[in-house]
Amino acid sequence: SQLFHEINSCTGGISCALQVFSNEKKENGCVCMFSVQAKYLYSQQSFVFKIISEILLNSRLEAKKRLYEILSSQKMQLQSALTVSGHMTAAQRALSYVSAVSGWQERISGISYYRLIEDLESHFDEKKEALICKLQRLIKLIFRPENLTVSLTADGQGCSGLEKEVKKLKEVLYTESLQKGNFRWIADQKNEGFKTSGQVQYVAVAGAFRK
């Protein structure tokens, strides 16, 4: 796409991901964040912040055909990743029952996430409107000034002008009042199995040393 070529011709890449950080002061506490990472030459700083703002605030979530393509692509990637790394899949699933951080990671990259994507893709016609509404609400909950954290690796020259760009970005983020939700993790003990086409079986047991 035009955006893809523009990003790659002017930067070293811009990527988005979900990240989870543990909270050492609170047992089973964690901080979940949507991160945008960019690599760029100092001369491209303004361009990078402009593109980040464009991606976060002007993405066409109502483009149903593209939304379905993304779901299908995610499903295929997950099918391959979860099967090829069966040992990691099993370990992550087991840990999700004893750790809030692992529980969140499992929901955004593990079997739970795969099941969600599979369900949305299989019943896209029935669920597309609800999905779009939820995505539109999520961007207004996530992309807010109070949620913004900036981390930069650069020398003095690279840091100059950063404050100005961050201020401009904060000014266009969402500020309307919305009811917020939260991630609720419940410790559990399950004995379960998952069948794949693979010939190798993986068994995982997890526990918390502090307990």
Task: Please name every model-derived segment.
Residues S1-R184:
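Charge-rich, well-structured scaffold segments of protease-associated domains
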Residues I186-G193:
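Coiled-coil termination/hinge junctions
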Residues F194-K211:
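Long, His/Glu/Asp-enriched segments that create or flank divalent metal/ion-associated functional microenvironments
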